[in-house]
Regions:
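Predominantly soluble domains enriched in secretory-pathway, periplasmic, or organellar proteins
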Residues: 1-178
Length: 178
């Protein structure tokens, strides 16, 4: 098992051994790729890296350490998750979640959400995607591709994490609160 670390400013991804936390290697990315969030497809040994700079989704082959594909989506892409062979990608510019078929790289759809979706967390057991937006948290059913719940908030949600054991949602805000 591995730990993958995004190094935004050095434009690289570090790989550590999970059990020892020993450094194994760095994968240097192209000059215009700044990894912030990414997801791993362990079966295919691929990393999907959304770009907030150029609206591209980069596909990194972890076995050879090279970008093997890029998919033009557009906008300011900020977060990504893999669920049921589909990629869910947040786009702050269009206030939407873009859905892509991982096997074909074809678009499946776009779900409009509230203002500035940035972070999200996926509950793959219940097929739910929880999206942090400014002044709300949106819950999306990943099977029907529809919003099943909206929670209005009086804070600017930025990142979000589910605690499935406690059945709680944690979110950090733009002004540094949890």
């Amino acid at each position: 098992m591995k730990v993958y670390v995004s190094n935004y400013l050095s434009r690289s991804i570090s790989i550590l051994d999970y059990s020892t936390l020993e450094f194994e290697r760095d994968i240097k990315l192209d000059e215009n790729i700044y990894p912030h969030n990414f997801c791993i497809d362990n079966r295919q040994q691929l990393a999907y890296i959304p770009s907030s700079l150029d609206g591209e989704l980069y596909v990194l082959d972890l076995s050879i350490g090279k970008i093997i594909d890029n998919i033009s989506i557009g906008g300011k892409l900020t977060n990504i998750a893999l669920c049921n062979d589909e990629l869910f990608i947040s786009n702050e510019d269009s206030n939407s979640i873009y859905i892509l078929d991982v096997k074909t790289s074809n678009p499946i759809g776009v779900i409009g959400v509230d203002n500035m979706p940035h972070g999200f967390d996926i509950d793959s057991i219940n097929n739910r995607l929880y999206v942090a937006c400014i002044n709300s948290i949106i819950c999306i059913d990943t099977i029907s591709k529809s919003i099943c719940k909206k929670i209005d908030t009086d804070f600017k949600s930025w990142h979000i994490k589910l605690d499935r054991n406690k059945k709680e949602i944690y979110t950090s805000t733009l002004d540094g609160k949890v």
